Amino acid sequence: MKTLVMGGTQFNGLALVRELAKHGHAVSVLNRGKTPVELPLGVARLTADRTDGAALRAALANHDWDVVYDVTAYRPEDVHLMAELLRGRVGHYVFVSSTVIYAPSDRLPISEDFPVDRSPQQNEYGRLKIECEDFLVREQRERGFPATTVPLSMVFGPNNILPDREQRMFARLLAGRPILIPGDGSTLAQVGHVEDQARALRMLAQNPRTFGRRYNLTGAHYFSAEGYVDTFAAVVGVAPNKVFIPAGLMDDLYAGRVLLARAAVNAKVDIRSKERAGEIIQQRFLLTMLVQRIAPHLHHWNKSVVFGVDRLREDAGWKPEFSFPAAVEHTYAWFRSQGLHESLKCDWSWEDQVLALARDYKH
């Protein structure tokens, strides 16, 4: 199949390009051409800044595609223009969304028919992803535009452009640092391996059953916060020095009753957000660096958040190949192969503040 990946040079997009090329697809990527990366042999490169409508029109002119995977659409105007340019010229348009769209729920797992969150607590990223999905559903229903939306949850694996997730945990354990765990460590979460997610996206291609539908895409296994730490420690081969943050202190940190000095954050992602989070929300996101958590602006620190993937299994025949321990093992092997066990630099000052508070906390 003739496929186009919007982006295609970092993490999710790069894994998808490699998966498609491995299975014989004629793959093109479209991006600004600024990220140095080795792509599989035969992958064609189209260059344009998608925020420049004229440049995007020129780059896509005279092309038809069997499938277009849009990994870099963050705003409604992105998908509006893609629908305009691709109408009648694409067999399937797959929009990569995010599970941040969903409202908090006490019923788990969260499936595709659960309510989305349009409340004031939703952030700009989530609001705009919802608007993108709304538009594509209308386009499919009213004009037959062959669109599918795929919300990803926390993605895990080699080349992650958010080093403060799994890579930071490897670094903590290797440095012998205390491992901070929120509350009693029983809260459940879930990640998906980037290569499993690339396979799922490939398997969705040109399946008419998926048109106009949403598919959650993440791992099949859940883990507790303490289980997350224990799994990492077993893979790294160390005994973790676990420090449990008292629930009362976590409540104070989440509510902003205790505010700490900020630390540097490692990230290479640009979601073109114009919104700047307030100090309390920023602190909540810093807390998710301790043990991975999704959407702390919506979900309280001690609320389990997991997503169902049964629809994807049923309609595309996909199932994850990586268990959670296998995903950690695979990612740690990559981490060491890249020399990150020696070169990754982390700012621990914020964690040190939390550690001091946890040790001195009076119940």
Residue ranges, per PLM feature:
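N-terminal Rossmann NAD(P)H-binding glycine-rich loop of SDR-like oxidoreductase domains
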Residues: 3-23
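Glycine-rich Rossmann NAD(P)(H)-binding loop
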Residues: 6-7, 182-187, 215-222, 233, ...
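NAD(P)-cofactor binding segment of oxidoreductase domains
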Residues: 63-110, 130-137
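Active-site "gating" loop of Rossmann-like NAD(P)-dependent oxidoreductase/epimerase domains
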Residues: 98-123, 138-143, 160
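Conserved beta-loop-beta element that borders a ligand/cofactor-binding pocket
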Residues: 133-159
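Substrate-positioning beta->alpha
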Residues: 163-169, 182-205, 212-213, 226-227
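Mid/C-terminal beta-alpha module of Rossmann-like enzyme folds, strongest
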Residues: 203-296, 309, 358-363
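Amphipathic terminal alpha-helices
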Residues: 324-363
